[in-house]
A protein has these predicted regions:
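Basic, helix-initiating cap at the start of DNA-binding domains
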Residues: 1-28, 32-44, 58
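Short hydrophobic/aromatic patch on the recognition helix
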Residues: 42-53
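Alpha-helical DNA-contacting segments of helix-turn-helix folds
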Residues: 59-67
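Amphipathic alpha-helical segments used for helix-helix packing
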Residues: 100-123
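Amphipathic alpha-helical packing segments from all-alpha helical-bundle domains
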Residues: 119-148, 156-160
Length: 200
């Protein structure tokens, strides 16, 4: 069988739809965007859009996931620069918050008008925790195996907590309350000591 060349057409169509959806979200707002709006922006029929995405909610979730995964490699490289797990957690979480604040899609999701929908989608779908685990679980597992964090910590639960902390901080900073430096200090003061082995 001949080797396949070029891009996967299905992937190209999905990307086109997602790009169109994101432009509609920015133009109309997430809750007011319809599948018809997306189809029109993508220059496709609604039937084609529905063939790839069952509803607007699945579009939102995949958009968030796509953008997060594009940031995964640079995020890992940034975290790896720090010599200790304490610094990796503090600086890595703060960097993720900063990236979220710069991302127009995340910026929309955590705005007051969209926050209820965002919380429902990302929490109910488990996507926020899944994405946080993709980034953090290998780093945390390595630290746990090296004895740098407690052996009894449930890493899945810890990733869930990190996800919630990041979403909360992005929401607060996006709303004009709090500061990243104060958030950094809270992580250093409360999160880090809870993870370290006794005696550290």
């Amino acid at each position: 069988m001949a080797a396949r060349t070029g891009n996967d057409p299905a992937t190209d169509v999905r990307t086109t739809i997602l790009t169109a959806a994101e432009s509609c979200f920015e133009r109309f707002g997430i809750t007011k965007t319809t599948m018809e709006d997306v189809a029109r922006a993508a220059d496709m029929s609604r039937a084609t859009v529905y063939r790839y995405f069952s509803d607007r909610e699945s579009l939102i979730i995949e958009s968030v996931a796509r953008r997060a995964r594009l940031n995964m490699t640079p995020a890992r490289a940034f975290i790896a620069k720090w010599p200790t797990i304490e610094e990796r957690l503090v600086e890595g979480i703060c960097q993720n918050v900063e990236s979220g604040l710069r991302d127009p899609m995340v910026h929309l999701l955590v705005s007051p008008s969209e926050m209820t929908l965002a919380n429902s989608l990302l929490t109910t779908s488990g996507k926020a925790v899944e994405l946080t685990s993709e980034l953090w679980e290998p780093i945390l597992r390595e630290a746990q195996e090296a004895g740098d964090i407690r052996a009894d910590i449930d890493l899945t639960l810890l990733c869930e907590w990190i996800s919630e902390l990041e979403i909360m901080c992005i929401s607060q900073l996006n709303g004009g309350t709090g500061s990243l430096e104060r958030f950094r200090e809270k992580i250093r003061t409360f999160l880090i000591p809870s993870l370290l082995p006794a005696g550290d």
